[in-house]
Regions:
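P-loop (Walker A) phosphate-binding loop of NTP-binding proteins
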Residues: 29
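Short beta-strand-centered segment that lines the nucleotide-binding/catalytic pocket of NTP-utilizing
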Residues: 47-62
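Conserved lysine of the Walker
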Residues: 34
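Short phosphate-coordinating micro-motif centered on Lys-Gly-acidic
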Residues: 43, 80-82, 86-141
């Protein structure tokens, strides 16, 4: 991914897939592009409000999306038990509203989530990003 717009485009692409994920786990260091990817996802869902990382609020719900979007950020939760508990609460709510759940800093979780898609973003030396998508049930893309 050569720049943040390419990262957003990847987010839009994921939502447009016939078998798009209902649970997307994002991993990567600060500045790797996790929130930019969520901006692309939200754009493809018709969400027009600004998308920022919910680092302090921990989660943000966008019920107007098609489908709705729940954006969870586990950055501040250093203990796995707290991250797991919050994730399970948000997952239940997302399921109830038919939403896609996107989790930033998913490496904080210790849960087995076989239905999840996992996207790892990392920095490249040329300033771009490398994205590796793993679909647990269907292998790696």
């Amino acid at each position: 991914l050569k720049d943040l717009e390419a990262t957003r485009a990847l987010g839009r692409y994921l939502v447009q897939q016939p078998e798009r994920p209902s649970l997307l786990l994002l991993e990567g260091t600060l500045g790797a592009g996790k929130t930019s990817l969520v901006q692309g996802i939200a754009s493809a869902m018709g969400i027009n409000e600004p998308i920022t990382s919910p680092t302090f609020a921990l989660s943000q719900h966008y019920p107007q999306g098609k489908p709705p979007l729940v954006h969870l950020d586990l950055y501040r939760l250093e203990q796995q038990a707290a991250a797991n508990e919050l994730f399970l609460q948000e997952e239940e709510e997302a399921l109830g509203m038919g939403a896609m759940l996107v989790v930033e800093w998913a490496e904080r979780l210790s849960l087995q989530l076989p239905e999840a898609w996992r996207l790892k973003l990392s920095h490249r030396n040329d300033g771009g990003r490398l994205a590796r998508l793993t679909r647990s049930k269907a292998g790696t893309c």
